[in-house]
Amino acid sequence: MYRIRVLLVVSAFLFTSPVVAQDWSVFRGPSGDGVSEYKNLPIEWGVDKNVFWAVELPGDGWSSPVVVDDQVIVTSAVAQQPTAEKSAYDLAVVAYSLKTGKALWNSKVFVQPETAPRIHQKNSHASPTPVVHKGRVYVHFGHQGTACLSLKGELIWKTVAVEYKPVHGNGGTPIIVNDTMVFSIDGAATTQVVALELATGNVRW
């Protein structure tokens, strides 16, 4: 199934004073509760109302965008054959300018082959949200792998050390705990919690 994803930025983000502005670098925001400190947020928006820019995103993905250093960063799974029933996917990280919506970089980190385990039709191959920590972008694509990039889209490391067969695909977003990235695995035969070292991507436990 082909879906169109649109990324839009509402006026509140661009009119917020730098004194109170805060990066939204993880899923559900800096406090983890989904609550924003921004005041007077618009409650209505449309094509010509309270929207500064909108761009059509490549591919599919349920991941939420994160905002760091005037960049909007999101993951995507782009089908190599969009109209085919089965296709290989390019798993990528994409960044846009918060102020203009201009594409800043697009980094492909994994290729999912046609033979990869299938997922639920309502899930995507790019569902976990990126995490930005100390100038690095950490992305997780479930059983397809995990990677670390710079804020310029340069690959620092990637790993497929944690392999498992998924049931419905992946949706769990990693969290940062000290010097590790922790995420859950809900596989057909394996259910566990994994920690990777932030510096190398090696499995800590």
Predicted regions and their residues:
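Noncatalytic, solvent-exposed loop/strand surfaces
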Residues: 18-205
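Positively charged n-region of N-terminal signal peptides that target proteins for export
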Residues: 1-5
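Bacterial N-terminal signal peptides
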Residues: 7-17
